[in-house]
């Protein structure tokens, strides 16, 4: 009796549910933009104070429509937890330059930041 009731509910619910999700099946799947050999940053989910949010940079070894396998990390990583690592043009500094000024005291130095 219970199995027959379950069968009836299944037939009553399945068709409207399938019709409700049909529009999602008709949409084309848009894969992530990452390809083999790309360099990517991987999101660090648990960060401590002053720790960067992104672990950097890893090379993409394998891809699926939703995940990436990168060199140096054993687990697959969802594409939403990755961003492309851009490399600065050759000969340019990626950040600010620092200048060291020494003082009379050998244990003291002064660091000043210059323009990038």
UniProtKB/Swiss-Prot annotation:
EC code: 2.7.7.-, 3.1.-.-
InterPro entries reported in the protein's UniProt record: MLVIN_C (IPR040643)
Pfam families: MLVIN_C
Gene3D superfamilies (alphabetical): 2.30.30.850
Keywords associated with the record: DNA integration, Endonuclease, Hydrolase, Nuclease, Nucleotidyltransferase, Transferase, Viral genome integration, Virus entry into host cell
GO biological process: DNA integration; establishment of integrated proviral latency; symbiont entry into host cell; viral genome integration into host DNA
Transmembrane segments: none
GO terms for MF: endonuclease activity; nucleotidyltransferase activity
Miscellaneous information on this protein: The Rauscher and Friend erythroleukemia viruses contain two components. The spleen focus-forming virus (SFFV) is replication defective, and causes foci of proliferating erythroid cells in spleens of infected mice. The second component is a replication competent murine leukemia virus (MuLV) that serves as a helper virus for SFFV.
Protein name: Pol polyprotein
């Amino acid at each position: 009796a219970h199995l027959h009731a379950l069968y009836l509910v299944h037939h009553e619910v399945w068709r409207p549910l399938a019709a409700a999700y049909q529009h999602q099946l008709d949409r084309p799947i848009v894969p992530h933009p990452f390809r083999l050999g790309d360099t990517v940053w991987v999101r660090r989910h648990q960060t401590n104070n002053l720790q960067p949010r992104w672990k950097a940079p890893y090379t993409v070894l394998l891809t699926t429509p939703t995940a990436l396998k990168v060199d140096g990390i054993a687990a697959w990583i969802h594409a939403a937890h990755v961003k492309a690592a851009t490399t600065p043009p050759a000969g340019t500094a990626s950040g600010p330059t620092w200048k060291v000024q020494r003082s009379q005291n050998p244990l003291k130095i002064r660091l000043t930041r210059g323009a990038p």
